[in-house]
C-alpha cells in the first residue's frame, strides 16, 4: 500500500487558530487541479498501481472549499481511480464543515477516509484556541460520517490554552464513546508567526514541559490503543518547515516525540501487568 500525499496548505480553513501559522506560510495561495496533478506525478513513478494505493489531501480543511473547487481538485485523482492506479482517497477537514451534501460529493470521488481536526472536546479549550466550533459539531460530524460509511480519524492535542490534564482525560472518554478507527496525537508547540506566540510573549500562556507532554500523550495513547483505536502518529513531523531556525519559539519539542511516549506507555503497561 502506498499513500500519495497532496498538500493544499490552509485551503478551505476559515479560521486562524491561535497555534497555527499556515496563513503566514501559504498566504492567499489557491490550489488548482494542475497543482494536484504535479504532486501526484512526483510519486507515481515509484509506486505499483493497485487498489490498496490511496491519495491523501493534507494541510487544509478540504470540505471548506467551494464545491466546484473540490471537484476541480478531485479531477486528477478521479483519473487515477478510473485507471486503477489508486483505490481510494483520504482527506482532513473541520468538524463544522461536514454535512450530507459535502459527504455525497466526497463519496462521488472515491473518498473513504475522513480525518477531523478535533484537538479537544472541551468547549472552553476550543474557545481559547479560537477554533470556531464546539464539541457538539464533532459529535454531529462523527455521527454523519458513520451513517455514510466513512472510516474516521480524529486529531487530538495536549497542552492547549486552558487545557488541564483533567480536560484531556475527559476528552479521551468522549473519544472512546465516539469510536473512531484511528487517531493522531500532537503536543502543542508555540510556533513563530502565530497568535499564540504573542500570547506567550505577554506571559499569558505557559506550554507544557516535555515531561508533562509525554505523560499526557502516553495517557491518551494508552487509553485509545487499549480500546482498539489505532494511533497512527504521535508528535509533529520534524521537517524543515517546523525545525527551521527560530520556528519553534517554545514548547515540548522532541524530534522523535513518539518514542518517549511509546516507552512510557509500555512501562506503565508492564507495571500494571505485574501488580
State where each predicted segment sits.
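Short acidic/His/Gly/Ser-rich catalytic and metal-binding motifs that mark active-site loops
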Residues: 13-17, 191-197, 242-244
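Short glycine-enriched loops at secondary-structure junctions
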Residues: 9-12, 186-191, 237
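Conserved mixed alpha/beta catalytic, RNA-binding, or beta-rich assembly cores of soluble enzyme
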Residues: 230-266
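Conserved non-cysteine loop/helix-boundary elements of the Radical SAM core domain that shape
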Residues: 25-38, 44-46, 58-184, 188-214
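Canonical Radical SAM [4Fe-4S] cluster-binding loop centered on the CxxxCxxC motif
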Residues: 1-35
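Helix-loop elements that line ligand-binding/catalytic pockets
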Residues: 221, 225, 232-234
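Conserved small/polar residues in nucleotide/adenosyl-binding loops
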Residues: 264-274
Amino acid at each position: 500500500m502506498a499513500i500519495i500525499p497532496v498538500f493544499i496548505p490552509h485551503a478551505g480553513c476559515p479560521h486562524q487558530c491561535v497555534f497555527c501559522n499556515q496563513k503566514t506560510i501559504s498566504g492567499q495561495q489557491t490550489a488548482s487541479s494542475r497543482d494536484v496533478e504535479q504532486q501526484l506525478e512526483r510519486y507515481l513513478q515509484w509506486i505499483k498501481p493497485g487498489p490498496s494505493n490511496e491519495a491523501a489531501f493534507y494541510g487544509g480543511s478540504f470540505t471548506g472549499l467551494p464545491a466546484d473547487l473540490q471537484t476541480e481538485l478531485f479531477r486528477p485523482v478521479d483519473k487515477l481511480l478510473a485507471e486503477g492506479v489508486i483505490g481510494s482517497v483520504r482527506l482532513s477537514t473541520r468538524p463544522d464543515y461536514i454535512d450530507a451534501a459535502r459527504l455525497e460529493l466526497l463519496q462521488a470521488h472515491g473518498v473513504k477516509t475522513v480525518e477531523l481536526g478535533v484537538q479537544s472536546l472541551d468547549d472552553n479549550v476550543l474557545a481559547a484556541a479560537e477554533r470556531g466550533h464546539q464539541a457538539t459539531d464533532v459529535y454531529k460530524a462523527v455521527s454523519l460520517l458513520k451513517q455514510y460509511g466513512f472510516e474516521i480519524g480524529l486529531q487530538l492535542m495536549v497542552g492547549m490554552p486552558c487545557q488541564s490534564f483533567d480536560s484531556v482525560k475527559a476528552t479521551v472518554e468522549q473519544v472512546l464513546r465516539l469510536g473512531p478507527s484511528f487517531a493522531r496525537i500532537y503536543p502543542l508547540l508555540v510556533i513563530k508567526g502565530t497568535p499564540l506566540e504573542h500570547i506567550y510573549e505577554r506571559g499569558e500562556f505557559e506550554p507544557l514541559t516535555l515531561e508533562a507532554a509525554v505523560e499526557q500523550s502516553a495517557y491518551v495513547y494508552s487509553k485509545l490503543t487499549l480500546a482498539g483505536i489505532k494511533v497512527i502518529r504521535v508528535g509533529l513531523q520534524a521537517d524543515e518547515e517546523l525545525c527551521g531556525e527560530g520556528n519553534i519559539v517554545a514548547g515540548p519539542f522532541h524530534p522523535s516525540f513518539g518514542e518517549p511516549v511509546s516507552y512510557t506507555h509500555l512501562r506503565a503497561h508492564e507495571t500494571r501487568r505485574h501488580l
